[in-house]
Amino acid sequence: MHSTNKSHNNSLANAWLKLGIISLGLGGLYSIILVVLRTPQLSSFFLNQRIFKSALIIHVNLSILIWLLSITASVWGNETSLRLVKRRGIFIPFGLLREIVTFYTFDRNDVLYIYPKLAFFATLLIAISPLAGYNTVTNNYIPMLANIVFILGLSLFGVTLLLYAINILYLFDWMKLNNLVNVTVFSTIIMFILSFVCFGWSYKSLQKIIQIIPIEIEFYYELLFWSGGHLLQFIYTQILIFIWVSLLRTITVRELKFQTFYLFILYLNFVFSILILFGHISYDIIDIAFKEFYTDHMKYLGGIAPILCLVGMVVELVLMSYRDKLVLLIYRLSTKSSKIKKDCITLSNHRTHSIIKTILLCSITLFLLGGLIAININDINLVIPAHYHGSIVGISIACMGYSYQTIIPLMDHDIHKTTKQYLITLSINWIKFAIYLLTFGQILHILGLAFSGIYGVMRKDPNSIVPMSSKLLMGMMGIGGLIAIVGGLMFVYICGKTMFFLKGMKLEYE
């Protein structure tokens, strides 16, 4: 039964991971348009400037919202014990009723595999939605295209993920809330459900207001997604902490000494996220204090948990004893010298650790850079997206680490000569190069955005007047963006080729 559960979980997790990779790839294609239109020398290639905002909206939704939530859904499916029997502790006295409940539970597990397919269809609707019209609404967190195709796609994705979360929660093992995995799964599911509570609360409040006074569509969507969008950022942070600690545990090859501390951080971030509900309780949605509450909430509480996590990780590494280092060295030497089966290629563990170290370094660097830039925000200009790009791409690279960690064990299995050509593309050096390229490009892109914002270039407007002094910075931003796109698409290519096309690597449902 346990192996069957594990097969269920791995297959389900990979389905969501595939969706995340697809959405990231599609978002990367749209980002090419954004970079070209933001680069003075290249913007003349696009005569219709409305394409910029449409591309921006689709890019944000595909490469942030759907990508990060797909990784979150993958974590739910991969790490949760999906029980194929009735709930523990429920007494069912009648045999027929017991059979019905058992059959229903099996059926629920089968239904879980429908959700990634529905989400994939929703993602395609979002990707092609610009064909239905360019009526753009550039509100924060979940920017909108006001056409039926986009709204259907976004609604389908949200409802699908909500139903999936409720199903996972139904099958959740409530007796094991003392480990990192289950706390992450439980807390992020509750946070995601609460984000829908916020969306519903905001919608109800706005419906009452528009009956009295008209509201501009951009202001409407800004308020509709403001509270729930803030809560989504805390979900991303929760997943970030989980992945950072998981990657650290992989490279240290031992149980972490500060396990309880990391659990405390996850619970702390969870409690901070729940405080978001007080914005709706304390303020009217039309009141300016409503938006300020969430801005201050993010400003003062959003970075506490990840910073504490980084402190714990640094102390963990510093306090690693010489004995542990010696054991680690012996372990790596033993894996390096182990025999390789005939006609097979095996990726050694020490190289896997090298990739994970690279991912951790790049993720932490970009996340901290985004935090430092946030200190300099004092106007509505390009400093704001510079901060957000740093933080969110730092989280995104951590999610890439989760993806690589999922794929690499498959590559460690026996891979025969017939697939050797694929391994050239999937080699460790290419993986590390993709991550470094993405990070370097993003640093250039972020710094170009930040300094352009300091010189007064406004956000969300490709036609804003660009001072001569910031032309070079905008060019740096464009070049950095293109470099980052290449790195990101390399990631999509490597992971996509492994998960979709490499024979012998599929996890079949048993």
Curated annotation (Swiss-Prot):
Annotated keywords: Cell membrane, Membrane, Transmembrane, Transmembrane helix
Keyword Transmembrane helix: yes
GO BP terms in the entry: aerobic respiration
Natural source organism: Rickettsia prowazekii (strain Madrid E)
Cellular component terms (Gene Ontology): plasma membrane
Family indicated by similarity: To A.aeolicus AQ_155.
Signal peptide as annotated in the record: none
Pfam families from the UniProt entry: COX1
Sequence intervals crossing the membrane: 17-37, 56-76, 111-131, 148-168, 180-200, 223-243, 261-281, 300-320, 355-375, 382-402, 434-454, 472-492
Localization annotation: Cell membrane
Name recorded for this polypeptide: Uncharacterized protein RP382
Top-level taxon: Bacteria
A GO MF label: heme binding
InterPro entries: Cyt_c_oxase-like_su1_sf (IPR036927), Cyt_C_Oxase_1 (IPR000883)
Coiled coil: none
Membrane topology designation: Multi-pass membrane protein
